[in-house]
Amino acid sequence: MTQNLQMADRFDSSAVEQALYKHWEEQGYFKPTENPSLPSYCIAIPPPNVTGSLHMGHAFQQTLMDTLIRFNRMEGNNTLWQTGTDHAGIATQMVVERKIAAEEGKTRHDYGREAFINKIWDWKAYSGGTISQQMRRLGNSIDWDREHFTMDEGLSNAVKEVFVRLHEEGLIYRGKRLVNWDPKLHTAISDLEVENKESKGSLWHFRYPLANGAKTADGKDYLVVATTRPETVLGDTAVAVHPEDERYQSLIGKTVVLPLANREIPIVADEYVDREFGTGVVKITPAHDFNDYEVGKRHGLPMVNVMTMNADIRAEAEIIGTDGKPLTTYEAKIPADYQGLERFAARKKVVADFEALGLLDEIKPHDLKVPYGDRGGVPIEPMLTDQWYVSVKPLAEVATKAVEDGEIQFVPKQYENLYFSWMRDIQDWCISRQLWWGHRIPAWYDEAGNVYVARSEEEVRQKHNLPADLALRQDEDVLDTWFSSGLWTFSTLGWPEQTKELKMFHPTDVLITGFDIIFFWVARMIMFTMHFVKDENGKPQVPFKTVYVTGLIRDEQGQKMSKSKGNVLDPIDMIDGISLEDLLEKRTGNMMQPQLAEKIAKATRKEFENGIAAHGTDALRFTLAALASNGRDINWDMKRLEGYRNFCNKLWNASRFVLTNDKLDLSAGEVEYSLADRWIESKFNRTVGEFREALSQYRFDLAANAIYDFTWNEFCDWYLELTKPVFANGTEAQKRGASQTLVRVLEKLLRLAHPIMPFITEEIWQKVKGFAGIDADTIMLQPFPKVVKSELDESAEMQIGWIKELIIAVRNIRAESNIAPSKGLEFLVRNVSDEQRKILAENDRLLKAMAKLDSVQVLSADENAPLSVAKLVGNVEVLIPMAGFINKEAELARLTKEIEKMRGEITRIENKLGNEAFVAKAPEAVIAKEREKMQEYQNGLEKLQTQYQAIENL
């Protein structure tokens, strides 16, 4: 019985992918079961910001996640890939603010808080839909019914619960401390949102007169203070020197007169001071510098805030004690002509006034890093503001121990050190933001200034017996976005309710993320989860067992992808293709700087002169997996993408060869499996072992390479060719053996490749399954291949390996001697073992067919051969008689190269064996092996020289 079908010449990804995905989703294949007895496997996706669309970094990480999810689903695990999006407070609010400004000329204040928030929800509906559609295009096997958003009602309840409980435990408090303040956006921002930019600045050296007649060691009546920020001088509350700096030791505890403000401030000793920086004397401004803030706390210095929220100079200084409360016992006046000045105008005036007073010592050029808000785009100010904080040290201790004890493992392991360095120096976390979009802080105030924290206003009134007519005002601030995303693994599973999903899927198995958010997100998830989620024995649960840290995807030149560089690649464009015109519009449209737009356009035209061709999702995913070497940044490579699109076509064509082969015989009857059949089954099982081992180590690159190497080099290039002589001249039993092996290995190969290449494997598998006698609906629920030890056949691998070498030797002789591939040749071998002689006899027909040979003859060791071109395969001489078509010059040139190569190997081993250190340290077996190799090479050299002499004498 034969069966075959029609298959298109090429795989058309655009005709297949979206229809297949729709079918998978409609059939519910992505959903976990409710069977609690099955082992579970869960990944919580790092939720993309709802602000825009997916970039290549998302595509990269999500491909790796989906590979693991699909693999585990095929392993029979109850699999959940929990997805969703993040409300991304500041980023989303800014996108919508810009949108209404551009389209309507309005600000959020024109709308008011409630109406503006409704505008953001409208934007979220649009943008979130875009992201989920893109994730579908990537083939992500997600249960979309469980999709969450960090502002969903359930997740909002979890946020309130965590806030209230931490407050009740005394771990959340409100206080006045120094924060990164964005004077344009009027909000505190996290360190992650601060971009330090290299800048050419100045180091001003000011003279601060010593008070009460004090003098320096060299007789001066002033100290020279070096600063990069003259505008904060009015907030100075001390100057500091290093305690071991002999120049100033006699002055410690004395005072200087602060110029312009005319108040005395102390000279303090602190190890923070760098004796080599400037003059070794620095001004201490605790209200306007993070390092000074810490120095101020150590020395009990007042904090004098001289700036408004706009970063202008205040009319009156705000004076705060180290306890964060107003300090009435300290006086610091701001001169009238500074009041209201913009900070950089104040800088100029301070410098001019110091110069006018004769107190400007010198100005030196100075390279420095200026912190900018990455959203507002202006320099941030360290600012004393009232904010809410989490006291994280107790949480951090537990979270640190979890990694130390191996409950959570980082891959690559070196990232554990980064985690530890942050966690062991952790500071209280500022969690409030002065925004409208986000989780509003669940705290209420009455007119007397009392603060009430609860899950709702109703709970506040009940808990504190407050009368209905007592006016309460909810805190205007919202929580840092990282607060809600820190609850992601458990809030998405229904916490604080003890749901069956929480019991079944928590802790999750692996988190795949970038190194840049290990502290901001990963650490906080570990801290929050272990504090709030306990197992049945009351032991803190980790959020995930493994953190796999990926590198960044960079462009082909190794540059970070960014809109301003104009080098961003959209993963959907890799899949569908894009014209040059559309790509130019995408990269330069709406750009504020025309010169930059022209530069980007020029670079784009050069790199993508014909736009980007369609490659399909499978080629994109395979490229991303193949590039995923552990922890390293990845330079995107369009040539690799093209290569893997060709690989998809190679797999398609191999399947087409099998399934449209009219000689394919899957009928019942006697079956005889050939050496080649046994070899390909054995090689397949080794590939399965390599893939499984690679995936267990998160070496997606090695897993992809194992599939590629087997498919292209073993199955397509060799096994398919090895079956052709069988179908041409084999017995019926041999044809059945080859037919069954072809179909069986192809079907298993599709299952092996499915986690990385879901679409093409499903499309082909639907055609293969009937041939393979499989009655099932989808490849994704088929078992993933396991290593079958009984199918491992070292003898078959050795024999076919040797036959391949003989065939390659003949092909190389043809190429080097310019002999047509179709020309029949005589084939002589000399110096073969009895076992090799047997292999040749059993595979005579195969060798003749594959190497296009007219005859195969074994010569005895002392038997002379006619004039031939020779190749060595190990010790065996492969000889092709050259009568009638030898090119004497070409053959002598080829032999010269072979002789030089052999001499090089002999010299290498001679040097090794002549190295006394090597001979002294190397085991006897290693030395014996080297001597054996030397003898082999010397014998080979002798044969090549004999051959050379014979041809030269023609």
From Swiss-Prot:
<dbReference type="InterPro" id="IPR001412">
    <property type="entry name" value="aa-tRNA-synth_I_CS"/>
</dbReference>
<dbReference type="InterPro" id="IPR002300">
    <property type="entry name" value="aa-tRNA-synth_Ia"/>
</dbReference>
<dbReference type="GO" id="GO:0005829">
    <property type="term" value="C:cytosol"/>
</dbReference>
<dbReference type="GO" id="GO:0005524">
    <property type="term" value="F:ATP binding"/>
</dbReference>
<dbReference type="InterPro" id="IPR010978">
    <property type="entry name" value="tRNA-bd_arm"/>
</dbReference>
<dbReference type="GO" id="GO:0004832">
    <property type="term" value="F:valine-tRNA ligase activity"/>
</dbReference>
<keyword id="KW-0547">Nucleotide-binding</keyword>
<dbReference type="InterPro" id="IPR002303">
    <property type="entry name" value="Valyl-tRNA_ligase"/>
</dbReference>
<keyword id="KW-0436">Ligase</keyword>
<comment type="subunit">
    <text>Monomer.</text>
</comment>
<dbReference type="InterPro" id="IPR009080">
    <property type="entry name" value="tRNAsynth_Ia_anticodon-bd"/>
</dbReference>
<dbReference type="InterPro" id="IPR009008">
    <property type="entry name" value="Val/Leu/Ile-tRNA-synth_edit"/>
</dbReference>
<dbReference type="Pfam" id="PF08264">
    <property type="entry name" value="Anticodon_1"/>
</dbReference>
<dbReference type="InterPro" id="IPR019499">
    <property type="entry name" value="Val-tRNA_synth_tRNA-bd"/>
</dbReference>
<dbReference type="InterPro" id="IPR033705">
    <property type="entry name" value="Anticodon_Ia_Val"/>
</dbReference>
<keyword id="KW-0067">ATP-binding</keyword>
<dbReference type="GO" id="GO:0002161">
    <property type="term" value="F:aminoacyl-tRNA deacylase activity"/>
</dbReference>
<comment type="similarity">
    <text>Belongs to the class-I aminoacyl-tRNA synthetase family. ValS type 1 subfamily.</text>
</comment>
<dbReference type="Pfam" id="PF00133">
    <property type="entry name" value="tRNA-synt_1"/>
</dbReference>
<keyword id="KW-0648">Protein biosynthesis</keyword>
<dbReference type="GO" id="GO:0006438">
    <property type="term" value="P:valyl-tRNA aminoacylation"/>
</dbReference>
<dbReference type="InterPro" id="IPR013155">
    <property type="entry name" value="M/V/L/I-tRNA-synth_anticd-bd"/>
</dbReference>
<protein>
    <recommendedName>
        <fullName>Valine--tRNA ligase</fullName>
        <ecNumber>6.1.1.9</ecNumber>
    </recommendedName>
</protein>
<dbReference type="InterPro" id="IPR014729">
    <property type="entry name" value="Rossmann-like_a/b/a_fold"/>
</dbReference>
<dbReference type="Pfam" id="PF10458">
    <property type="entry name" value="Val_tRNA-synt_C"/>
</dbReference>
<keyword id="KW-0175">Coiled coil</keyword>
<feature type="short sequence motif" description="'HIGH' region">
    <location>
        <begin position="48"/>
        <end position="58"/>
    </location>
</feature>
<keyword id="KW-0030">Aminoacyl-tRNA synthetase</keyword>
<comment type="function">
    <text>Catalyzes the attachment of valine to tRNA(Val). As ValRS can inadvertently accommodate and process structurally similar amino acids such as threonine, to avoid such errors, it has a 'posttransfer' editing activity that hydrolyzes mischarged Thr-tRNA(Val) in a tRNA-dependent manner.</text>
</comment>
<feature type="coiled-coil region">
    <location>
        <begin position="883"/>
        <end position="954"/>
    </location>
</feature>
<dbReference type="InterPro" id="IPR037118">
    <property type="entry name" value="Val-tRNA_synth_C_sf"/>
</dbReference>
<feature type="binding site">
    <location>
        <position position="563"/>
    </location>
    <ligand>
        <name>ATP</name>
    </ligand>
</feature>
<feature type="short sequence motif" description="'KMSKS' region">
    <location>
        <begin position="560"/>
        <end position="564"/>
    </location>
</feature>
<keyword id="KW-0963">Cytoplasm</keyword>
